Amino acid sequence: AQEATDYLRSMFGGQYQTLKRVAIHAVDKQYAALKNLVDTALIPEYFHDNFRHELWHLLNGHYNEFSSDQKNKVIEIIEGLEVVDEDKSVNARATAYKRTIWLSAIKDYSDRTIELYKKYTTITKAEPKHPDFSSYMTSVWVEHKSPIPIEHLLTLSVDSLVETINNYKDTGRGWLDEP
């Protein structure tokens, strides 16, 4: 077990995002043996779109097993997330949306997490979709609205935004039938 821990620790310390994602996934799937690496995964760098799938599942599956300090650290990181506009001002609604994404993983674990989740969904007026979905879908058409919520687009890094736009498939059905 020590060899696995040491190897995963080196993956966390490496330069490649893919290896860091694999390390987070391993901690999630082998939590009992690797829980001593949780602190390594609880850093602001990983509360980002590129790590969303793996970290969200780690939080969702094991937050209740974290120490009080680890739980507080997660909340502190989430509360510190901000989305800024081009003019460098904080976009309150996009920031709230980004926070709800992470809070959705832990919202059912305590009154505090439920309260924070409700606070931010009140601001966004929407609950985030499950992180396993790479795009957002709806069966409701809203006149003159983008098929991808602006709050979601504002939370994306440049690379994620380009990927989201490039992966969008126009069905040719027009706005009425678009997601």
What spans do the regions from the language model cover?
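Non-catalytic all-alpha helical scaffold/repeat segments
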Residues: 1-179
